[in-house]
Amino acid sequence: MYYYRANQVICRYQIALHDPVDPALLQRALDEVRPLAGWYFQKVVWEKREAHLAPNDAPCRVTVGEAAPAIPEATNDYLFSLHCEGTTIYFDWFHFLADGRGFSPFMTLVLRAYCNLRYGTAFACETLAEDPPYDPELLLKEFPESQKAGAEQNQPIDIFEGKPDRIRLRLDRASLIEAAAREGVKPFTALMGIVCQGCGQYLEKGELLYSFAADLRETMGLPNARYNCIVTYQLPLKGAAGARLSAFAKALDAAIREHLKPERLRYRLAEQMGFVCRVFQQKAPLKIKQRIFQMGEYLSGSPADFWVSYLGDPFAPRSPELEAYVEDFQTWVLPDGASLAMEVTSLHGVLTACIENKVHRPGLAQALARAFAAEGVTVLEAAELDEQ
């Protein structure tokens, strides 16, 4: 569906190793895994009435520097870039190529190959299995009621736009789990609830519209889906800014759990894909389809004050042996349909929350730190990384 979008969402994995990265060895690692990870070595082919992915046989180059080359203009039409500087490796990619869980196996594979070359390890580097795409038409037949207007509509809200400022929050994972256990809720619920407290104070709003993403691979029976396989929800919450977590944790947990039920997830996917299918079926030039899609996305979209995406352990499969070579891991994604975007990963017992903030007002890091500390969660860092 992202082919039709005017503005593509770019994601970043930022991996800090203990030692300086050797660009030549990183290039060798990328070349070695190429035959094992065909999905990622593709390009978009633009036809008169449609666009599709096709294999790309051009050279795929590792570059040096923190700044990503323009994708796909400066990457030989590849939809990702791999670059490094100092001790850090950067992966940048278009979200329509893969979501976070879809990209993690490739990132893990490249790191395994690099460590084998750099440190003489013997990590297995095996071909990544690929599940075929699901049929959205069958999904729509299963849930025809999902296409009724206003099925999941919230009151529209205004969101901030512009270049975001970056904020980083680091939390002790064990203390968050303890806070969740005290309330009898999921750790993600505790995380979301406390973020609602901090964001409510920062935005000075008594009612928030929060958003979160849910992975459908297990629900759809597609564990090896490399493509984008998530849904998003936008849900309201009142009174979090002036309340303790205990006052609303159970209700928040019930709402999140309800929306994570398999049937609800499939229904939501049908909702999201319905308009995409209708646009695809139009017998019109691609540029017209893009305009129709953008108009429909604007009219039917439900922007949120903020969204939270929890990746957890970033490596797939999980590998404590590989993690030993990694000092830090950060995930950055531009806010899409929200004023704030938070990506959370877990490594070495630390939750790292990378926040992109379009509000352009100082104080968010401090507001979140106060909210987490008040609920007994140990805050290891709360930093505004860009000048306000």
Features from the language model and the residues they span:
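Non-catalytic, low-complexity flexible loops and terminal extensions
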Residues: 1, 97-179, 373-388
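Acyl-thioester-dependent acyl-group transfer interface
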Residues: 1-49, 56-81, 200-388
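Generic anion/oxyanion-binding catalytic loop in active/binding sites
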Residues: 15, 95, 165, 179-180, ...
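Acyl activation and transfer enzymes in specialized metabolism, enriched
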Residues: 19-35, 92-108, 168-204, 353-355, ...
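Short, charge-rich amphipathic segments
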Residues: 37-45, 119-134, 174-190, 294-310
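Histidine-centered acyl-transfer/condensation active-site motif
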Residues: 69-120, 124-136, 345-362, 372
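Amphipathic alpha-helical scaffolding segments
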Residues: 108-111, 197, 210-213
